[in-house]
Amino acid sequence: MWLGVITLFPEMFRAVTDFGVTGRAVKNGLLEVQTWNPRDFTHDRHNTVDDRPYGGGPGMLMMVQPLRDAIHAAKAAAGDRAKVIYLSPQGRKLDQHGVTELAKSECLILVCGRYEGVDERIIQTEVDEEWSIGDYVLSGGELPAMTLIDSVARLVPGVLGKQASAEQDSFSDGLLDCPHYTRPEQLDGLDVPAVLLSGDHEKIRLWRLQQSIGRTFLRRPELFENLALTDEQTTLLAQFVNETDKSA
């Protein structure tokens, strides 16, 4: 998968290209990340990349010409196959369904805003989609872009050692993940659930599924609005609720 990033701070993306799962994906040729800095497309000796907004008000906007030229350079490198995404608080909120959609793309160009944002006409003429990672304000689009890259890269075949790792992640099936345990068997008086030590794979599967459903019910009940539970899941949820009520 190829990703182009328009950013005033390309050095930040070493966190993606040099470390962890995404770093290994880059090293193994499964993921390619290229950056374009609008400062490299300026024509003044100060490398100016911000400009005053029409109508006044606080803050500055990213200057149109360097930003637009950087986007055009990324498009030229990617070809017609690239989808241009602007990371914006006004965009569609990123969730696992959205990540799955984006992971089907061969090429993505991510535009990272700074200051008060970008000229609306850039969005109208150069951007295909706007995406947001949440209802809060950040200093720029770099962290959202890295979040998107990391989440999408996990779904690229071969990036994770086992595809089951992605399939069992929180939200992969619309549910939160179940609890996980490793050694030692007892920690500060708390034991690993006996079922996980039983060796009975079917019982372990059912326990994990029930815990996943129950955790979603307790912590993120709104997620059930978009889920159609199977008969098995409905039964496990009813059992979980009954056991929770008894222990309350």
Curated annotation (Swiss-Prot):
Subcellular localization(s) per the UniProt record: Cytoplasm
Chief localisation class: cytoplasm
Keyword Methyltransferase found: yes
Residues annotated as binding S-adenosyl-L-methionine: 113, 133-138
Keyword tRNA processing: yes
Cellular component GO terms, alphabetical: cytosol
Enzyme class: transferase
GO biological process, one term: tRNA N1-guanine methylation
Keyword annotations from UniProtKB, A to Z: Cytoplasm, Methyltransferase, S-adenosyl-L-methionine, Transferase, tRNA processing
SUPFAM superfamilies given in the database record: alpha/beta knot
Reaction it catalyzes: guanosine(37) in tRNA + S-adenosyl-L-methionine = N(1)-methylguanosine(37) in tRNA + S-adenosyl-L-homocysteine + H(+)
One MF annotation (Gene Ontology) recorded for this entry: tRNA (guanine(37)-N1)-methyltransferase activity
Pfam families: tRNA_m1G_MT
E.C. number(s) listed in UniProt: 2.1.1.228
Function: Specifically methylates guanosine-37 in various tRNAs.
Self-association state and partner proteins as the record states: Homodimer.
Family: Belongs to the RNA methyltransferase TrmD family.
Protein name: tRNA (guanine-N(1)-)-methyltransferase
Organismal lineage: Bacteria, Pseudomonadati, Pseudomonadota, Gammaproteobacteria, Alteromonadales
